[in-house]
Each structure stands twice: as C-alpha cells, then as structure tokens.
Amino acid sequence: MAVPRRKTSPSRRGMRRSADAIKKPTYVEDKDSGELRRPHHLDLKTGMYKGRQVLKKKES
C-alpha cells in the first residue's frame, strides 16, 4: 500500500483545500435588456444568446 514519505504541512494542506470553498455564482448585466444573467447563458426574458434569437420571447 502506498504511504506518503513526509507529513503534509498545514500550509500545503490549506492550499489544497482552498479550491473546495463554495463560491458565489457570477452574474453579468445583459447589454440589451439590462437584466442579470449568468455568463455564457442565454437571457430568458429576450431569448437572445450572443446576438442571435435562440428562444421565442417570453410573454408576461
């Protein structure tokens, strides 16, 4: 069975665990509608993605 040669220092252990934190999702303001949306996702109100109409406009 594989065994580590040296004890992992608290600093190195902390650096490894730094990626485990839960991060807040990023939002950007849409240029056309001004609504907040996730980056690289389409705007559900307008149905636009990268300047193209992908979905039909949502009727409210």
Curated annotation (Swiss-Prot):
GO terms for biological process: translation. Gene3D superfamilies: Single helix bin (1.20.5.640). Residues 1-16 have a biased composition (Basic residues). Keywords: Ribonucleoprotein, Ribosomal protein. Residues 1-60 are annotated as: Disordered. InterPro entries: Ribosomal_bL32, Ribosomal_bL32_bact, Ribosomal_zn-bd. GO terms for cellular component: cytosolic large ribosomal subunit. Belongs to the bacterial ribosomal protein bL32 family. PANTHER family: 50S RIBOSOMAL PROTEIN L32, LARGE RIBOSOMAL SUBUNIT PROTEIN BL32. This is Large ribosomal subunit protein bL32. It comes from Bradyrhizobium diazoefficiens (strain JCM 10833 / BCRC 13528 / IAM 13628 / NBRC 14792 / USDA 110).
